C-alpha cells in the first residue's frame, strides 16, 4: 500500500471516529436534556420546609405525625466553622471548589466500582441535599435518569444559592435520630446547647450521623458512634483543618462527653415505637423514600387495640406472672390470610426516651431451637414424599450427626425407640428430627425454608433443631417476625405471605402507592394440614400445654435453646433446668404468633417458671384475639384420609400389615426413607411395639436442660 493510500485511509478513519464521537455527544446530550426536562423545579420552600409524615393504623386513625415535633432550624451565622469543616471533610472534600457536581469524584467512584465490582456514589453535598429534598434514597432507584436530574438540579442550585446557604439547608434538613431533625435540634436535645457552643468532638459526632443516624446514635450504639466520630476527625486532620494535637485530644474524648439524659422525642404512644420503626424501614424498602425526611401519609396494618393489649401483657402482671422485670419478650402477630402484621413488640419496659431503638422482634441473633423442626424437617419430609402419614414410624435411638462421630442427644439423654412421627414432634425428640433432615437432604430443606422466608448462608444438620447461623446479618436465621410468617403458611393451607406493615402510601404530590400482598405457594395443602394436625397434639399432650385453650382450635410448637457445657461450667454453675431462650410459635385459622423470651444478657438463664412465659404470652394474646369470634377448625383437604388419630396420604397404608407405597428416595441423603407407616395405640405414649425402647430415667448422664431443649454440639462437618 503506497503512502497516499495510507494517508487517505488514516484521514477516513479519523473523520469516521470524530463523527462517531460527535454523534455520541449529540445523542448523549439529547438523552441528558430529555431526562432533565422531566426534573422537578427548584423551590426554596421545599429546601427549607419542615416536612412531616402522618402515620395511620388499620382503621385510618392517626397514630403519629413524624417530623413535626422536633425541628429547630439553625441560622447561617450561628453555624460554627468547625461543623462546616467536619461536614465537608466526611461528605465532600471539594465542596467549595465544584459547582454542584464533582467530576474528579465521579471518575474516582467509577474506577473504584470497576475494581471492586460494586456501586459507590460520587455525589456531592449539594447532590445529597437535592436527593433528600426531591428523590428516593434507595439504591435501586439510582437510575441514569435520576442521576441526570439530580446533577442538573445541583448545578441549578449552585447558581442560585451561596455555599453557605446550601450548607445551611443541609444542616437543617438531615435526620439525626431519636426524632430530631436538623443538627441544631440534635445539639439542643443531646447536649442542651446550641451548635455554636459545642466542642470539636461533639460537632464531629453530629457531622458523621446523617449517613446512618440510627446506626450512629450515641445512646443506642456508642461504639459505632465513636468510630464514626473518629473517622470524621481523621478526615479533618488529613484535610489540614485540625492539628495532630487537636485530633489526639478529640479522639480520646469519651463519646458520652456532654451527653444529657435523652428526653422523649415522640408524639405517639410508647407501645407503637417498635412497630413504627419497621414501618419506616418498609416504606424505604418499598418506595425508596425515607418518611422521616420526606413528607407523606402512610397507612399501616397495625391494630392499635391489639398492639396496646400486647403491651399490657408484657408490662403488667395481670396476664403473665413474670419472674422479674429484666426478663424480655419479643413477638409478632400476623394475619394468616395476607401476611399483614397486626401487632409487634420487641421488649418489656422499654425506655420512653429512645425512638426507633433495637427491635428484638425482628432480630435473628437468638436461637429458635425446636420451633425449627416443623419447617426444617417434618414439613419438607411430608412435602417431598419422604413420609406419607403422621403415623410413619421414626427412630429415636443412638444416632450421630451425618458424616461425623458427634452424637445427637435428646434432652433426657434417653431414647424412646420406634415412635410415630406425630409423637416425635409432639414430644420434641431431637434424634428423629436430625435423621429426618438427613432423609430430606440439606438442599431440599434449604429450598423449602426459602419458600417460607427463612434463609441460611449454608445449612447444616444441626439446623434440624436450631436456627443458629454464623452470619450476623438479619437476612439469615429466624426472628419472631419470620417465624410468625412461616407458621402462617401452615394455618392458611400452604401459602407464604411476606410480613407487611404498610398497605398504602400517599406522597406529597397526591400520588399513591398501594401494597397488595400476593402470596406464593410454599407447600401443598395436604402438607400444611398434616403438620397442623400433629402440632395440635403439642398443645394437648406435648410440650406446649401452657398454651392450650380447650375452646380454641390451634396448633403450635415450643422451642428451647441451651448452653454449652463450657458455658454451664464457667458462667451458669447450676444443676437446674436452664436455658438462654424459650420460644413458642403457634396459630389459629386467623392469626399466627411467634414469641421469644430470654434475657438481654444471654448468660443470664431462664429458670423455673421463666421457662413457661413464652407459651403463656401466646395464650394470653390468642385469648384476646379469638374470644367472641366463633373460631373455626381446619377441614381435611382432598388427598388425605383419617384413621383414628392419624392422617394419611391417599394410597398410604394405615394398618400394620398392609403394604407401604414406594417412597421416592432423597437424592442428597446418605440414607433412604425406608421407614414404614403404622398406627399407634396412643400418640401420648411411646410405641410399645419396640423392644429396644429405653427408659430415659435409667441414664447415668443427666442433662441440665428442659424437656424441649436440643443439644448444641459444635458445627458438624458436612459429609
From Swiss-Prot:
This is Penicillin-binding protein 1A. Residues 62-223 are annotated as: Transglycosylase. It comes from Streptococcus pneumoniae serotype 4 (strain ATCC BAA-334 / TIGR4). GO terms for molecular function: penicillin binding; peptidoglycan glycosyltransferase activity; serine-type D-Ala-D-Ala carboxypeptidase activity. In the N-terminal section; belongs to the glycosyltransferase 51 family. In the C-terminal section; belongs to the transpeptidase family. The keyword Hydrolase applies. Pfam families: Transgly, Transpeptidase. Its EC number is 2.4.99.28, 3.4.16.4. InterPro entries: Beta-lactam/transpept-like (IPR012338), Glyco_trans_51 (IPR001264), Glycosyltr_51/Transpeptidase (IPR050396), Lysozyme-like_dom_sf (IPR023346), PBP_transglycosylase (IPR036950), PCN-bd_Tpept (IPR001460).
